[in-house]
Amino acid sequence: MGKLVINSYDEFAAHLGEELGVSEWLQVDQDRINLFADATLDHQWIHVDVERAKKESQYQSTIAHGYLTLSLLPYMWDQIIEVNNIKMLVNYGMDKMRFGQPVVTGSRIRLVTKLHNIQNLRGICKSEIEFKIEIEGQRKPALEGIASFLYYFI
Protein backbone atom coordinates (compact mmCIF):
# COMPACT_ATOMS: atom_id res chain seq x y z
CA MET A 1 0.00 0.00 0.00
CA GLY A 2 1.40 3.39 -0.98
CA LYS A 3 1.44 6.56 1.03
CA LEU A 4 -1.96 8.20 1.46
CA VAL A 5 -1.90 11.69 -0.09
CA ILE A 6 -4.23 14.32 1.40
CA ASN A 7 -4.65 17.78 -0.17
CA SER A 8 -7.55 19.26 1.83
CA TYR A 9 -9.72 18.91 4.90
CA ASP A 10 -12.51 17.33 2.83
CA GLU A 11 -10.14 14.69 1.44
CA PHE A 12 -8.98 13.91 4.97
CA ALA A 13 -12.55 13.75 6.34
CA ALA A 14 -13.53 11.27 3.62
CA HIS A 15 -11.39 8.67 5.44
CA LEU A 16 -13.22 8.92 8.78
CA GLY A 17 -13.40 5.48 10.39
CA GLU A 18 -10.96 3.96 7.90
CA GLU A 19 -7.53 2.46 8.32
CA LEU A 20 -5.12 5.06 6.97
CA GLY A 21 -2.19 2.74 6.56
CA VAL A 22 0.62 0.72 8.06
CA SER A 23 4.28 1.73 8.26
CA GLU A 24 7.28 -0.38 7.36
CA TRP A 25 8.87 -2.50 10.08
CA LEU A 26 11.59 -0.70 12.06
CA GLN A 27 14.19 -2.54 14.13
CA VAL A 28 14.85 -1.14 17.60
CA ASP A 29 18.51 -1.91 18.28
CA GLN A 30 20.76 -1.22 21.25
CA ASP A 31 22.45 1.74 19.54
CA ARG A 32 19.09 3.51 19.14
CA ILE A 33 18.24 2.76 22.79
CA ASN A 34 21.61 4.08 24.00
CA LEU A 35 21.22 7.29 21.99
CA PHE A 36 17.76 7.81 23.48
CA ALA A 37 19.13 7.16 26.98
CA ASP A 38 21.80 9.80 26.40
CA ALA A 39 19.29 12.31 25.03
CA THR A 40 16.85 11.86 27.92
CA LEU A 41 19.36 11.14 30.70
CA ASP A 42 17.47 7.91 31.45
CA HIS A 43 20.19 5.28 31.85
CA GLN A 44 18.20 2.74 33.86
CA TRP A 45 19.96 -0.61 33.60
CA ILE A 46 16.98 -2.38 32.00
CA HIS A 47 17.64 -0.22 28.93
CA VAL A 48 21.43 0.07 28.71
CA ASP A 49 23.19 -2.69 30.69
CA VAL A 50 23.14 -5.65 28.30
CA GLU A 51 25.02 -8.07 30.58
CA ARG A 52 22.97 -7.30 33.67
CA ALA A 53 19.73 -7.55 31.68
CA LYS A 54 20.73 -11.01 30.42
CA LYS A 55 21.10 -12.16 34.03
CA GLU A 56 18.45 -10.21 35.94
CA SER A 57 15.69 -9.14 33.56
CA GLN A 58 12.63 -11.32 33.01
CA TYR A 59 13.14 -10.56 29.29
CA GLN A 60 16.78 -11.75 29.36
CA SER A 61 17.60 -8.68 27.29
CA THR A 62 17.51 -4.93 27.50
CA ILE A 63 14.25 -3.25 26.51
CA ALA A 64 13.48 0.03 24.77
CA HIS A 65 12.26 2.96 26.82
CA GLY A 66 8.49 3.29 26.47
CA TYR A 67 8.97 6.90 25.46
CA LEU A 68 11.46 5.85 22.77
CA THR A 69 8.71 3.73 21.26
CA LEU A 70 6.36 6.72 21.43
CA SER A 71 8.97 9.05 19.94
CA LEU A 72 9.16 6.89 16.80
CA LEU A 73 5.49 7.59 16.03
CA PRO A 74 6.17 10.71 13.87
CA TYR A 75 8.78 8.86 11.79
CA MET A 76 6.41 5.97 11.12
CA TRP A 77 3.40 8.30 10.61
CA ASP A 78 5.35 10.08 7.87
CA GLN A 79 5.62 6.75 6.01
CA ILE A 80 1.83 6.43 5.98
CA ILE A 81 0.52 9.86 5.02
CA GLU A 82 1.51 12.95 3.08
CA VAL A 83 -0.58 16.01 3.85
CA ASN A 84 -0.12 18.81 1.31
CA ASN A 85 -1.26 22.44 1.27
CA ILE A 86 -0.53 23.08 4.93
CA LYS A 87 1.39 25.88 6.65
CA MET A 88 2.29 23.66 9.57
CA LEU A 89 1.46 20.60 11.62
CA VAL A 90 1.27 20.80 15.42
CA ASN A 91 1.03 17.96 17.93
CA TYR A 92 -2.10 18.57 20.02
CA GLY A 93 -2.20 15.71 22.50
CA MET A 94 -2.59 12.05 23.35
CA ASP A 95 -5.60 10.22 24.74
CA LYS A 96 -6.03 6.71 26.10
CA MET A 97 -2.32 6.00 25.61
CA ARG A 98 -1.25 2.66 27.08
CA PHE A 99 2.01 0.75 27.00
CA GLY A 100 0.92 -2.84 26.36
CA GLN A 101 4.27 -4.57 26.59
CA PRO A 102 7.95 -3.68 26.31
CA VAL A 103 9.92 -3.71 23.09
CA VAL A 104 12.79 -6.16 23.58
CA THR A 105 16.02 -5.00 21.99
CA GLY A 106 16.30 -6.27 18.42
CA SER A 107 12.52 -6.40 17.92
CA ARG A 108 10.84 -4.85 14.91
CA ILE A 109 7.90 -2.49 15.33
CA ARG A 110 5.43 -0.83 12.98
CA LEU A 111 2.60 1.69 13.20
CA VAL A 112 -1.02 0.87 12.30
CA THR A 113 -3.41 3.84 12.06
CA LYS A 114 -7.11 4.65 11.70
CA LEU A 115 -8.86 8.03 11.46
CA HIS A 116 -10.85 8.11 14.71
CA ASN A 117 -12.27 11.64 14.47
CA ILE A 118 -11.78 14.84 12.48
CA GLN A 119 -13.01 18.40 13.01
CA ASN A 120 -12.71 21.66 11.11
CA LEU A 121 -11.96 24.31 13.73
CA ARG A 122 -12.24 27.55 11.72
CA GLY A 123 -9.80 26.36 9.09
CA ILE A 124 -7.64 24.25 11.38
CA CYS A 125 -8.03 20.53 10.88
CA LYS A 126 -7.97 18.63 14.17
CA SER A 127 -7.42 14.97 13.41
CA GLU A 128 -7.57 12.21 16.00
CA ILE A 129 -5.59 9.18 14.87
CA GLU A 130 -6.16 5.84 16.57
CA PHE A 131 -2.79 4.13 16.58
CA LYS A 132 -1.12 0.88 17.56
CA ILE A 133 2.59 0.25 17.56
CA GLU A 134 2.84 -3.46 16.93
CA ILE A 135 5.77 -5.75 17.69
CA GLU A 136 6.53 -8.32 15.01
CA GLY A 137 5.37 -11.77 16.12
CA GLN A 138 3.41 -10.49 19.14
CA ARG A 139 -0.37 -10.25 19.58
CA LYS A 140 -0.33 -7.44 22.13
CA PRO A 141 0.87 -4.02 20.90
CA ALA A 142 3.77 -2.18 22.49
CA LEU A 143 1.73 1.01 22.59
CA GLU A 144 -1.73 2.18 21.60
CA GLY A 145 -3.83 5.30 21.93
CA ILE A 146 -5.22 8.29 20.08
CA ALA A 147 -2.86 10.98 18.80
CA SER A 148 -4.30 14.40 17.99
CA PHE A 149 -2.73 16.66 15.38
CA LEU A 150 -3.60 20.14 14.13
CA TYR A 151 -3.12 20.65 10.40
CA TYR A 152 -3.15 24.28 9.29
CA PHE A 153 -4.36 24.06 5.69
CA ILE A 154 -3.55 26.97 3.37
Name each model feature, range by range.
Residues 78-82, 102, 118:
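Alpha-helix capping at helix-to-loop junctions
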Residues 94-99:
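Short alpha-helix capping/helix-loop boundary micro-motifs
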